[in-house]
Regions:
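A hydrophobic alpha-helical transmembrane-helix feature that marks the membrane cores
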Residues: 2-246
Length: 246
């Protein structure tokens, strides 16, 4: 039966075909799924900010991070979570997936806590909104584009490994300000592209038609990916545009 008005008994009744009904249900389900992804991500960003402020108010912890090995523990922990968390999130329970996400967010918060001492509050707020605008634009593009971004995503994922190696080499051996400046420009561009790719991938996962538990874990994993891209962009843009305290 085609979509159209039914005027029997003086009443107008719109009907839809089964295919149209299914499409409407998919659209509603997709919106709910993506909203859950973005809600988790936003909560993760807020949690990171809270942890960063709490750590910044504790001089002993700050000293351990800035003047001790704790910064390397956090750095290695964050990198390790990037490899381990996806397996846990997709193979364990929803609670395990949530726990990984919150631990990851907390470690990032502790790592960037020194920013409250290094940079002015105005520049932190400004760079945060710049990052949010760039993230929103690229995520919207990834969600709406009909172009397959898989090839771009694979290339950018390979580029992140190169960036990671260059970062470690520069921190430990070279300590080159020029290379650091170059990375501050390149890294946000890479993760902006990854934001679009990840959004497209996260959207495609919904159409796999999993049970609610699996879909919930996918939304947490999707938030984990987008959160990582957002925070990485913010960190490097801070080093590029942040204004140091006098």
């Amino acid at each position: 039966m085609a979509l159209g008005p039914d005027r029997r008994f003086g009443m107008r009744v719109d009907t839809m075909t089964p295919a149209q009904t299914q499409a409407a249900e998919i659209d509603a389900g997709l919106r709910q799924y993506m909203l859950r992804v973005y809600n988790y991500m936003a909560l993760g960003v807020a949690f990171t900010g809270i942890i960063a402020m709490v750590v910044a108010m504790n001089p002993a912890v700050m000293q351990a991070i800035v003047g001790g090995p704790m910064v390397w523990v956090l750095f290695i922990g964050i990198i390790g979570m990037g490899f381990v968390a996806p397996r846990i999130m997709m193979s364990k329970s929803v609670l395990a997936a949530q726990s990984c996400f919150w631990v990851y967010s907390a470690m990032w918060g502790a790592l960037i806590a020194p920013y409250f001492y290094i940079y002015t509050q105005e520049s932190i707020a400004r760079v945060f909104f710049i990052t949010a605008a760039a993230f929103a634009g690229m995520s919207l593009y990834g969600y709406t584009t009909k172009k397959d971004l898989s090839a771009m995503g694979r290339f950018l994922m390979m580029a992140t490994f190169g960036i990671l190696i260059a970062l470690v080499v520069n921190l430990v051996f070279l300590q080159s300000s020029g290379l650091h400046l170059l990375m501050s420009i390149v890294v946000p561009l890479i993760f902006a592209g990854l934001t679009a790719y990840e959004t497209q991938q996260i959207k495609s996962w919904y159409y796999e038609g999993d049970m609610e538990d699996a879909t919930h874990k996918k939304s947490i994993f999707g938030a984990f990916l987008l959160y990582g891209s957002f925070v990485t962009m913010f960190v490097w843009l801070m080093q590029l545009f942040g204004v140091a305290r006098e």
